[in-house]
């Protein structure tokens, strides 16, 4: 009895099962070309570098890179120091002119650049001596009295001293006596109510005079 199973025709090729064909197409379609990997430097730079607008500098760096502003100072025009023409008026005897010039050079050459009035240098030519002195005293914040043996023997110097006290009778610190070549016993009685600068030091008391002037100028508002 002949078998019912049919054999393939001669010369025909066997066909793949449909299930295997579907799997083969699926795998082929799902395959994608591999991308070229980025270099580690470009990847890290792209991923970790934020924009300059989004990330402010750390405090330590910003304080270094930011331009520093100059310290603020009070306006020259608004300071009471500039309400007068001079910071210091130096009163001295004629024989002490060299010592007075040295003192003025020291004060004007300091970092404070103090403005000094020296009568023989700054008085108006042709002006009355008394008027020039009174004008200089009223136009100065401080008065330095260079008290020496020649100062005590000169009536004109005593007038300068009394006029300086009259200009500012209650202003503490604006009249600065500089005692040079004299003992304390020779200190004028008119000045016994205020301390003096001892000129026997190596700098002749110039530094203390400058500091006293600066202290007074700092009290001006």
Curated annotation (Swiss-Prot):
Extract the ranges annotated as region (Disordered). 1-82
Looking at the UniProt record for this protein, which Gene Ontology cellular component terms does it annotate, in alphabetical order? cell surface; cytoplasm; cytosol; endocytic vesicle; extrinsic component of cytoplasmic side of plasma membrane; plasma membrane; ruffle membrane
Q: What mutagenesis or variant effect is reported for residue 55 to N? A: Does not affect NF-kappa-B activation and TNF production
The parts of the chain that form a coiled coil are none
- The signal peptide, as residue positions, is none
Key word RNA-binding present: no
Q: In which tissues is it expressed?
A: Highly expressed in liver, kidney, spleen, skeletal muscle and heart. Also detected in peripheral blood leukocytes, lung, placenta, small intestine, thymus, colon and brain.
The TIR domain is annotated at 84-213
Record PTM text: Phosphorylated by IRAK1 and IRAK4. Also phosphorylated by BTK.
Transmembrane spans: none
What does the UniProt record report as the effect of altering residue 197 to I in this chain? Answer: Does not affect NF-kappa-B activation and TNF production
Gene Ontology BP terms: 3'-UTR-mediated mRNA stabilization; cell surface receptor signaling pathway; cellular response to bacterial lipopeptide; cellular response to lipoteichoic acid; defense response to Gram-positive bacterium; inflammatory response; innate immune response; MyD88-dependent toll-like receptor signaling pathway
Alphabetical keyword list: Cell membrane, Cytoplasm, Disulfide bond, Immunity, Inflammatory response, Innate immunity, Membrane, Phosphoprotein, Ubl conjugation
What's the entry's take on its domains? (Microbial infection) The TIR domain is structurally mimicked by the TIR domain of B.melitensis protein TcpB.
Protein name in the entry:
Toll/interleukin-1 receptor domain-containing adapter protein
User: Which one of the record's GO molecular function terms can you name?
Assistant: identical protein binding
Mind telling me which Pfam families this protein's record contains? TIR_2 (PF13676)
Question: What does the UniProt entry say about where the protein is found?
Answer: Cytoplasm; Cell membrane; Membrane
- Domain of life of the source: Eukaryota
Instruction: Note whether Aminoacyl-tRNA synthetase occurs among the keywords.
Output: no
Give residue spans, biased composition: Low complexity. 48-67
Q: Which cysteines are joined by disulfide bonds?
A: 89-134, 142-174
Per the record, the gene is: TIRAP
């Amino acid at each position: 009895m002949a078998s019912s199973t049919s054999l393939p025709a001669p010369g025909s090729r066997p066909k793949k099962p449909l299930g295997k064909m579907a799997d083969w197409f699926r795998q082929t379609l799902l395959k994608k070309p591999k991308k070229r990997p980025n270099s580690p430097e470009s990847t890290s730079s792209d991923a970790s570098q934020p924009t300059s607008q989004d990330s402010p500098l750390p405090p330590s760096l910003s304080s270094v890179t930011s331009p520093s502003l100059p310290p603020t100072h009070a306006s020259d025009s608004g300071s009471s120091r500039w309400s007068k023409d001079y910071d210091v008026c130096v009163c001295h005897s004629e024989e002490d002119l060299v010592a007075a010039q040295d003192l003025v050079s020291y004060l004007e050459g300091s970092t404070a650049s103090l403005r000094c009035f020296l009568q023989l240098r700054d008085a108006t030519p042709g002006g009355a001596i008394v008027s020039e002195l009174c004008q200089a005293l009223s136009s100065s914040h401080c008065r330095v009295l260079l008290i020496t043996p020649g100062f005590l023997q000169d009536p004109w110097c005593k007038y300068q001293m009394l006029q300086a006290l009259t200009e500012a009778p209650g202003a503490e610190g604006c009249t600065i006596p500089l005692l040079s070549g004299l003992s304390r016993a020779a200190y004028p009685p008119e000045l016994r109510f205020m301390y003096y600068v001892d000129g026997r030091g190596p700098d002749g008391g110039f530094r203390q005079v400058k500091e006293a002037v600066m202290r007074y100028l700092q009290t001006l508002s």
